[in-house]
Amino acid sequence: MTPSTGPGPALEARIDALVARLDLERKVRLLTGASAWTTHGEPAVGLRAMVLSDGPAGVRGQVDDERSTSANLPSPTALAATWDESLVERLGRLLAAEARRKHADVLLGPTVNLQRTPLGGRHFECLSEDPLLSGRIGAAYVAGVQAGGVAATAKHYVANDSETDRFTVDVRVDERTLRELYLAPFERLVRDGGAWVVMAAYNGVNGSTMTESPLLADPLKREWGFDGVVVSDWSATRSTEASARAALDFVMPGPQGPWGGELVAAVREGRVPEAAVDDKVRRLLRLAARVGALAGVDPAAPAPDRPEGFGGPPMGRAAEEVAGLLRAAAAAGSVLVRNQAATLPLAADGLRRVAVIGPNAAVARTQGGGSVRVTPDHVVSPLDGLRAALVPLGVEVVHALGARIRAGIEPLTASQVSDPETGEPGMRLRFLDAHGEVLRSEHRTTGKLGWYWDDIPGGSPPSR
């Protein structure tokens, strides 16, 4: 594992010169997102917009539905259970290729909060309960992603280890526990992995919400030498002056936020030093240089090869290689806890009929939800997997529904409905304005529909 190297003096001098060319308003504009997933560009200094994408078990991209599929990695908990840093670094390189395929510059992962209880609502996207294991596997993940010229994001800094009241909870923790447990994985990701981005969490620690916390400066920036960007979790920035005076660098999502004109006024009135704004802009330009978003500067690593086109899955041999790597990772992270009477593996020549019982056997449940969720191109349910393995051997596989465990109604699948305009399997989705005029019409192949933040369908006005 080779951590990313720091910027050289020539690049630093150029960044200083670019910052000096911007007036206060343009500098402050750069420090809040342009949308839910993009930064502002600034042609005057050769800066293009950068795209951030959810992770960490895949790269979602800006389109979050069945039209933009993604490689679906095993749960990060399974990745840590492999205890295999080289394998995880390879998976990081795959994520970099996926990010570039979807035109993303920053991957919002890995999550290195600790699994304090099995009831934690997002622990499936964390690596483990052990700070050493989380740090080493997380650093390998970061190194792999950034080897492909894509920024990895260490999140959620720090002590965001419970979903309950995460927006308001104030975690009280002594110095030794904080450093030896909760900060330890982040330190490894910064020092060993060379992470380019760190995400400040929603929660507070010892009286300060994390977007205003002194922990962003020390130990993160000063003691550990972090020279990248500290981005807020989405809508986690609750103040203008306090957050700007802290070591927070970038507010998401945009374009609205507590900085903007309020921060310009705070600087002009002397409540926030302009040097603090300059440091934030300098870090953002440094990140842009690393991912290839700053004109005239070679990225820190070349973009990996990827198929042409936005969001399309790898084809042919590339798809086979990706599937093989994901399958190997899933197997490496699995543990057979007990094998009574050497029942497994089943001897196929002694089988005639196999019963598979339960509704979940027919469902390919490969991931959790929320920020970690992606739309895989292809999944295999336990039932389909057993049939594929056993039926060619002459074994009959019988499925029984068993007890119904789902409350409510399942969404219709594409095979159950047809588009009234084209007759294809699927549905016709129309977006109407307040007067019933069609703003947009599109064919969809899923009954599960959703939109995030300002991802309003084309032509629809934002409801702000």
Please annotate each region the language model reported.
Residues 1-464:
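Glycoside hydrolase catalytic-domain context in secreted enzymes
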